[in-house]
């Protein structure tokens, strides 16, 4: 008797040659979290792409927490439906800030991946990182930020103070286009 697989077969969006890509949408989601963000996202990339297409989005931005884990599946599924994937992630810093981070080119994509790897491999004090933990501070983010569009996210509680304490209160980030 053959063994049944322990995991179900992965679902995919079936390509359709008659499919017309959505027109330019006035609004698209940029901070979508997939099921690859443990205890945060519940939706499989297939479901997110199907929902984006159904809502008429011409693009969708994936932003898993300190991870690029969902981007490959989102990219493949989105292309099948004519939805442009905006590839990035949500960077959460040790200072308590969160940024949507979207690389502008291949080199910036590499820097973003190296930033995440650095945060996952070594703690800020130089010791090896515990599994599943990612420590990225603003200085580390600034060192890898060239060519990456960063959007600072407000706190969940808008009554919270939206500032951080820093030694000099200034963390230099590279300017766009300069």
Question: What is each of the regions a protein language model found here?
Answer:
Residues 1-178:
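Phosphodiester-processing cores and adjacent nucleic acid-binding clamps
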């Amino acid at each position: 008797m053959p063994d049944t697989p322990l995991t179900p077969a992965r679902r995919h969006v079936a390509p359709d040659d008659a499919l017309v890509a959505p027109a330019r949408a006035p609004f698209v989601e940029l901070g979508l979290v997939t099921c690859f963000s443990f205890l945060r996202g519940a939706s499989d990339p297939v479901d997110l792409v199907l929902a984006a297409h159904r809502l008429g989005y011409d693009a969708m931005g994936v932003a898993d927490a300190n991870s690029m884990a969902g981007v490959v599946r989102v990219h493949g599924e989105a292309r099948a439906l004519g939805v442009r994937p905006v590839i990035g992630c949500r960077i959460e810093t040790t200072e308590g800030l969160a940024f949507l981070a979207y690389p502008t080119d291949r080199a910036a994509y590499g820097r973003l991946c190296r930033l995440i790897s650095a945060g996952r491999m070594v703690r800020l004090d130089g010791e090896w990182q515990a599994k599943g933990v990612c420590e990225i501070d603003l200085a580390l983010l600034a060192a890898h930020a060239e060519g990456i569009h960063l959007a600072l996210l407000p706190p969940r509680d808008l009554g919270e103070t939206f500032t951080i304490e820093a030694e000099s209160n200034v963390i230099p980030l590279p300017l766009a286009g300069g």
